[in-house]
Amino acid sequence: MNNLSMYVPHIWKSELDSEATAFLSKYFPDAIKTPMCVPIEKIATEIMHLKVVEHHLSEDLSILGQMCFTDGMAEIYDPVNDEYREIFVKAGTMIIDPDTYAKRNLGSKRNTMAHESYHWFRHRRYHLMAAQLDNETRPVYRCPTVPKSESIQTEWTDEDWMEWQANNVAPRILMPIETVGAVYKKMATESMKNAFVAKGLRPQSEWIVEQTAGFYMVSKQAAEIRLKELGYLS
């Protein structure tokens, strides 16, 4: 273990919901009291005072977003000239690839914003200490689309662990454990008012997932995973 590893939060899988609750308790406690679409962009820009900008980050959307922890140069991709170049960024700048929304969906963009906001909330100290130890600026932490396999955790770096944390906490921020149950019950009740569901022409679970995703403004895949991990769907 290197000296920096002591600054990586040690979070068990069973503590991920508590992490999301801690984040929301600090920045937007109403979201754990009342079922709502968590206003993650407002949280990031107006409450955390992060600067959110859009730039392409890769040719193939392999990087969805990146968080800038110190002033310095950040690499972006210029699709017009098909080249990578650097731009100056200030600490607290969140860069989102516009294709996160254009080629995916709004839920993906919101999840990326929650992901990067969590990095700032929980991992900023690590990156600031790393900058001091290296005696250089470390402005950017780039977040890959495809996470590292959990089957090789023994080989993970500090960055891999922090990425795992952000990957798992972000959807929990957008769908807090404190409100998902109430939303599920509401959607389950309303589903029987849908003619196709009532007549057995459409699976009730499919309708519930779709409506829950719309309520929280997340992807249907994210909503289904969340409802299953909390035991509301089998």
Regions found by a protein language model. Give the residues of each.
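Active-site hotspot residues in diverse enzymes, especially metal/ion-binding acidic/histidine motifs
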Residues: 1-234
